[in-house]
C-alpha cells in the first residue's frame, strides 16, 4: 500500500524543485503489480498525481472534497469506493477532529481496513482509543474562554497551520530558530 497524504513546498528541502519532488512521490506509486495507491486530493500537487492516467489501482480520499472515493463530511466517513454512499459516523474519538492530519490519517486507516476486509468494529475501536502523537495538537487547557494547545511536534508552516484550522481568537506562541 502506498499513501500520499499531502505535498507541500515546505518539503522541498530535499529536492531541487517541485517537479522533482512530485516525480519522487510518483515513484512510490505503481511499484508492485497488486499495489494499491491511496492519494489525497486536497492539495493541488497530490490531486495532479491522482489525475495522472499512468497511476493505476488508486483510491482518492479527501477531507475537503465530497467527490473523492472516500471523504470526510459532517462527522462521517463517506465511502463511495467499497460501498455506494455509505456513511460511517465517527463517535467517541479522543483525537481532535478539527485537525486535517488526524482526519486524513483516519480516512487512510479506514481504507486500509476495508481493503484487507478487517471488520469495522476493529477500526472503530482503534480510532476511539488512539491518543495521538506526543506534542502533536495536545490540549493543555480547555475552558469557555481559552483553549491552549501544545503543537511543538509541528516542524513546518503547513503542519502548524493545520492545527489552527477552525480555531478562533488565536494567540500563537512560536519558538526556536
Question: How should these model regions be labeled?
Answer:
Residues 1-60, 71-74, 90-97:
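Flexible active-site lid/hinge loop adjacent to a nucleotide/diphosphate
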Residues 7-10, 62-66, 154, 175-177:
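Short, acidic/turn-prone active-site loops that include or flank metal/cofactor-
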Residues 28-30, 50, 68-69, 137-140, ...:
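Short secondary-structure boundary/capping segments
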Residues 38, 55-73, 124-128, 138, ...:
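Beta-strand->loop->alpha-helix junctions that form or flank phosphate-binding loops
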Residues 42, 63-66, 132, 142:
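Residues that form or immediately flank small-molecule/cofactor binding pockets and catalytic motifs
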Residues 70-91, 138-141:
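Acidic-glycine-rich active-site phosphate/pyrophosphate-binding loop
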Residues 90-177:
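Nucleotide phosphate-binding/pyrophosphate-handling subdomain across enzymes
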Amino acid at each position: 500500500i502506498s499513501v500520499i497524504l499531502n505535498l507541500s513546498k515546505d518539503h522541498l528541502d530535499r529536492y531541487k524543485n517541485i517537479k522533482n519532488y512530485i516525480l519522487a512521490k510518483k515513484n512510490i506509486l505503481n511499484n508492485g503489480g497488486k499495489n494499491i495507491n491511496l492519494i489525497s486530493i486536497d492539495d493541488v500537487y497530490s490531486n495532479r498525481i491522482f489525475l495522472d492516467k499512468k497511476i493505476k489501482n488508486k483510491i482518492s480520499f479527501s477531507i475537503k472534497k465530497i467527490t473523492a472515493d472516500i471523504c470526510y463530511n459532517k462527522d462521517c466517513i463517506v465511502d463511495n469506493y467499497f460501498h455506494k454512499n455509505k456513511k460511517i459516523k465517527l463517535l467517541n474519538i479522543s483525537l481532535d477532529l478539527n485537525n486535517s492530519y488526524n482526519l486524513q490519517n483516519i480516512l487512510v486507516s479506514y481504507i486500509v481496513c476495508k481493503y484487507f476486509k478487517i471488520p469495522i468494529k476493529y477500526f472503530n475501536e482503534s480510532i476511539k482509543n488512539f491518543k495521538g502523537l506526543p506534542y502533536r495538537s495536545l490540549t493543555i487547557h480547555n475552558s469557555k474562554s481559552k483553549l491552549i494547545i501544545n503543537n511543538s511536534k509541528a516542524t513546518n508552516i503547513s503542519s502548524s497551520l493545520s492545527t489552527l484550522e477552525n480555531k478562533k481568537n488565536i494567540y500563537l506562541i512560536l519558538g526556536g530558530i
